Amino acid sequence: GSAIACGESCFKFKCYTPGCSCSYPICKKD
């Protein structure tokens, strides 16, 4: 739910950082 990056990249799949979701190509806080 925010534009804050989580420091993890993703390719359409889940993010492993807690509280983060995939917003290709990076994970962002929900």
Swiss-Prot record:
Disulfide bonds join 6-20, 10-22, 15-27. One of its GO terms (biological process) is defense response. InterPro entries: Cyclotide, Cyclotide_sf. There is a cross-link at residues 1-30 (Cyclopeptide (Gly-Asp)). Keywords: Disulfide bond, Knottin, Plant defense. Pfam families: Cyclotide (PF03784). This is a cyclic peptide. Transmembrane segments: none annotated. Probably participates in a plant defense mechanism (Potential). Binds to and induces leakage in phospholipd membranes, particularly ones containing 1-palmitoyl-2-oleophosphatidylethanolamine (POPE). The presence of a 'disulfide through disulfide knot' structurally defines this protein as a knottin. Belongs to the cyclotide family. Moebuis subfamily. This is Cyclotide mela-5. The lineage of its organism: Eukaryota, Viridiplantae, Streptophyta, Embryophyta, Tracheophyta.
